[in-house]
Amino acid sequence: MERTCLAVILAAGDSTRMKSSKSKVLHPVAGRPMIAHVVEAVASAGISSVALVVGRDAGEVAKAASIDGVGIEAYLQQQRLGTGHAVLAAREAIAKGYDDILVTYGDVPLQTNGPLKAARQGLAEGSDVVVIGFHTDRPTGYGRLLVKDGELIAIREEKDASDAERAVTWCNSGLMAINGRKALDLLSRIGNANAKGEFYLTDLVEIARSLGGRVTAVDAPEIEMTGCNNRAELAVIERFWQERRRREMMLAGVTMIAPETVFLSYDTVIGQDALIEPNVVFGPGAVIDSGAVIHAFSHIEGAHVSEGATVGPFARLRPGADLAMGSKVGNFCEVKNGRIGVGAKVNHLTYIGDAVVGAGSNIGAGTITCNYDGVNKSETVIGENAFIGSNSSLVAPVTIGDGAYIASGSVITVDVPADALALGRARQEIKPGRATLLRQRALAIKAAKKAEA
């Protein structure tokens, strides 16, 4: 029978070191609040029940933590009296009788499911408490994990450690798993007879051992256990998240010419054999199919780029942009809520908004779909194999038929039938010699102003 598990995520801190008007767990990593990354890691470890301990910005934190497939109940910690006290804020959830209780933190967004699963496996093998630790060459400031005969005998804080204990490089991450059937009893035994008068979760190690229980530790990569307390640490976490995800994508068959200059979001999807040139930013909701090419300095969010399509350089795809196979959106173009058909070309200096561009159509440089009248947005529909001349303005709502031609510089306000030629501009006039007169007049005005000065 599969073991049941409750994850208790501690997210009630005051976030004072973040110097922010909002809780630190709401700050984004890869376009997503860091608390959501933690819930995702918990879910990927097979845990579908979460007790979220909140304090500051409780409603916003609970909302940010919500992801599909995970049941979350929020519990308010009224006072900040230590980690042991924080876990007991979720007493009601713990009392429901889970096999495993996993305690983690909302400001550790790089954690993955491996150490979480390992901690649960330790419980399944008979431990009452399993602490997740990490090895580091910079152990100063961390509690050391002291192990004897395969069991964790203590977590020694640095100020209390001997010289030999300070030499230990296996450190406490703060994350741990607890036997769910004994959790409330163990937690209720934590005292606050210390300098700060707080209840420390780490005391569970000695409490469980004093009751004859087995306590063990499992290892996690140091970077996965990195917590976030300020903006500098947030930047470090973002960098490592990006490096890890880029590597995963490249190993899956995505080419990144200068990966350190490519920035991904938490949900970016890029298919095999896609090519990503330098200095590309993917906002949330970007899907790039196999074989697509994203040229340098492009920004893509909420958009889909099909196989064989080309974007950029210096292009922007906004939410709702959908490029069909073999289509092209070139330099200094922006597409928002626009569908670009198979083989269609939007090559330069163009805005396509709330529009459909049919297969094989060509949109000339400087074309604008005028989709907004200051109050409402309207749609432009361009048929297949149409040709839109440069510097044209298509004032929505308007439809351009299949195979139609729009003369350069036109302002189109009326539907154009299929295979028709439309011109919407003033007729050109030529007046011989008039340029000389205009020039002489301008020079005379300039001379008069100079004389007055």
UniProtKB/Swiss-Prot annotation:
Location in the cell: Cytoplasm
Active-site residues annotated for this sequence: 348 (proton acceptor)
Cofactor, how bound (note): Binds 1 Mg(2+) ion per subunit.
Q: Which InterPro entries match?
A: Bifunctional_GlmU, GlmU-like, GlmU_C_LbH, Hexapep, Hexapep_transf_CS, MobA-like_NTP_Trfase, Nucleotide-diphossugar_trans, Trimer_LpxA-like_sf
Q: Where is this region: Linker?
A: 232-252
Reaction it catalyzes? alpha-D-glucosamine 1-phosphate + acetyl-CoA = N-acetyl-alpha-D-glucosamine 1-phosphate + CoA + H(+); N-acetyl-alpha-D-glucosamine 1-phosphate + UTP + H(+) = UDP-N-acetyl-alpha-D-glucosamine + diphosphate
Q: Is Hydrolase given among the entry's keywords? A: no
Q: Name one GO cellular component term.
A: membrane
Cofactors (names) = Mg(2+)
KW Disulfide bond (keyword) present: no
For the protein in the UniProt heading, the enzyme class is transferase
| Similarity comment | In the N-terminal section; belongs to the N-acetylglucosamine-1-phosphate uridyltransferase family.
Q: What is this protein called?
A: Bifunctional protein GlmU
Gene name linked to the record: glmU
